From Swiss-Prot:
Modification note: Highly phosphorylated.
Subunit-structure text: Homodimer. Homooligomer. Interacts with host RB1; this interaction induces dissociation of RB1-E2F1 complex thereby disrupting RB1 activity. Interacts with host EP300; this interaction represses EP300 transcriptional activity. Interacts with protein E2; this interaction inhibits E7 oncogenic activity. Interacts with host TMEM173/STING; this interaction impairs the ability of TMEM173/STING to sense cytosolic DNA and promote the production of type I interferon (IFN-alpha and IFN-beta).
Motif Nuclear export signal, chain ranges: 71-79
GO biological process, one term: DNA-templated transcription
Location(s) in or outside the cell: Host cytoplasm; Host nucleus
Zinc-finger ranges (unnamed): 53-89
Source organism, top-level taxon: Viruses
Protein name: Protein E7
Gene Ontology MF annotations: DNA binding; DNA-binding transcription factor activity; protein domain specific binding; zinc ion binding
The gene coding this protein: E7
Entry-linked Pfam families: E7
Gene3D superfamilies per UniProt: 3.30.160.330
Domain comment quoted from the record: The E7 terminal domain is an intrinsically disordered domain, whose flexibility and conformational transitions confer target adaptability to the oncoprotein. It allows adaptation to a variety of protein targets and exposes the PEST degradation sequence that regulates its turnover in the cell.
Length: 90
């Protein structure tokens, strides 16, 4: 904007990032490089989990949202050491 009074035509709306050359021996921050990489999140899906309370054998129903890989890991935990108890037994 130039002059004593700004006008609408003086406002520049094109704000594209500009390429700036690196100074000698300067390196990009790793966070700048990570911003340029598109990370694809695994698809989340709702899963119904039916299991038994380990103390009183009451049927427990859970709904969880997870990726397919994570729900398989959850299943492995349930088959091994992870035990879920009902609110009454907790």
């Amino acid at each position: 904007m130039h002059g004593p009074k700004p006008t609408v035509k003086d406002i520049e709306l094109d704000l594209a990032p500009e390429a700036v050359p690196l100074v000698c021996n300067e390196q990009l921050d790793s966070s700048d490089e990570e911003d340029c990489i598109d990370v694809v999140e695994p698809a989340q899906q709702a899963y119904r989990v039916v299991t038994l309370c380990t103390k009183c054998s009451t049927t427990l129903r859970l709904v969880v949202e997870s990726s397919e890989a994570d729900i398989r890991a959850f299943q492995e935990l349930l088959l091994r050491t992870l035990k879920i108890v009902c609110p009454r037994c907790a």
